[in-house]
A protein has these predicted regions:
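N-terminal single-pass transmembrane signal-anchor helix
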Residues: 1-31
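Preference for short coil/turn "hinge" residues that link or interrupt alpha-helices
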Residues: 19-21, 27-28, 57, 64, ...
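Glycine-centered loop/turn positions within well-structured domains
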Residues: 29, 55, 132
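Alpha-helix exit/C-cap motif
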Residues: 37-41, 49-70
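Periplasmic/extracellular, small/polar-rich flexible segments of pilin-like filament-forming proteins
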Residues: 59-139
Length: 139
């Protein structure tokens, strides 16, 4: 009696490759959108933290500051978010108000919708080029 070798046929292999290709085509854009939203959330959280620290500094010193170490950060000037996507900085500060910004640093498709976030001493939140990046979580 003859024994047959068992294995994967070329047709089965091709079907697996096609199914994986379809799954990748569907899943990858969704993954990219999720990653972009996570980076934006990280930038917004950093700006809100700076706003909180600025208010604490103001209560103690009766003025705002551009020096990040005065706010409790390890660096005096700009710093990057943990994902290295946004540069966070306090661009202006005086006795009346401050302005903190987060600017996207990479040259890819994610930068198009929410490249810049800002918050000031009055709590006004702005973004560019899209004006609703702070409130719209689907961007």
């Amino acid at each position: 009696m003859r024994k047959y070798m068992r294995g994967v046929t070329l047709m089965e292999l091709m079907i697996v490759v096609v199914v994986l290709g379809i799954l990748t085509t569907v899943a990858y854009p969704s993954y990219r959108q999720h990653a972009a939203r996570a980076k934006r959330t990280e930038a917004k959280a950093a700006l809100l933290q700076i706003a909180t620290m600025q208010e604490r500094f103001y209560l103690q010193n009766n003025a705002y500051t551009t020096n990040m170490t005065s706010l409790g950060f390890a660096v005096a000037g700009n710093f990057m978010t943990d994902s290295n996507s946004y540069v966070i900085s306090v661009t202006a500060a005086d006795a009346a108000t401050f302005n903190a910004t987060a600017v996207y640093q990479k040259a890819d498709a994610e930068a198009g919708k929410c490249a810049t976030f800002a918050i000031d001493g009055r709590g006004v939140k702005t973004s560019a080029p899209s004006v609703d990046c702070w409130t719209n979580t689907r961007l």
